């Protein structure tokens, strides 16, 4: 009995899906190497502007890398007695947890001085005392 209530809905929905599928067309695939920018159609002024923008972007990236290298060299000279190993960064929960644990370990007594342990014993506040003599 339930099948006859469900059958018209099933038939109409399948017809609707078929109509939608027939009206849709797949977009043509364009490879990453194929570009809409054709250098043959650019004017000389556009080519010069494009080249200037590419050079400016390259110079900005080179300056940024140079500043990062100087910062790392400065930090290495400041702490010449310790060797710093740099690893690839990872953003999974395990990696973040390990990084935070390392940060806490390196911070030393700063966290330990301000940390007050919680009272979690058998005689802790809020625990009910059980009488074994019933």
UniProtKB/Swiss-Prot annotation:
Function: CALCB/CGRP2 is a peptide hormone that induces vasodilation mediated by the CALCRL-RAMP1 receptor complex. Dilates a variety of vessels including the coronary, cerebral and systemic vasculature. Its abundance in the CNS also points toward a neurotransmitter or neuromodulator role.
Signal peptide: 1-26
One Gene Ontology term, aspect cellular component: extracellular space
Main location: secreted
Record keywords: Amidation, Cleavage on pair of basic residues, Disulfide bond, Hormone, Secreted, Signal
GO BP of this protein: adenylate cyclase-activating G protein-coupled receptor signaling pathway; calcitonin gene-related peptide receptor signaling pathway; regulation of cytosolic calcium ion concentration
Entry-linked InterPro entries: Calcitonin-like, Calcitonin/adrenomedullin, Calcitonin_CS, Calcitonin_gene-rel_peptide, Calcitonin_peptide-like
Region (Disordered), start-end ranges: 65-91
Pfam families per record: Calc_CGRP_IAPP (PF00214)
Domain of life, per lineage: Eukaryota
Modified residues (Phenylalanine amide): 125
Start-end of Low complexity biased regions: 77-89
Organism, as annotated: Rattus norvegicus (Rat)
Residue numbers covered by the propeptide annotation in the UniProt entry: 27-86, 131-134
Entry annotated with the keyword Cell division: no
Claim: Secreted is one of the keywords in the record: yes
Entry's localization field: Secreted
Official protein name in the record: Calcitonin gene-related peptide 2
Molecular function terms from GO: calcitonin receptor binding; hormone activity
Family stated for the protein in its record: Belongs to the calcitonin family.
Positions of disulphide bridges: 90-95
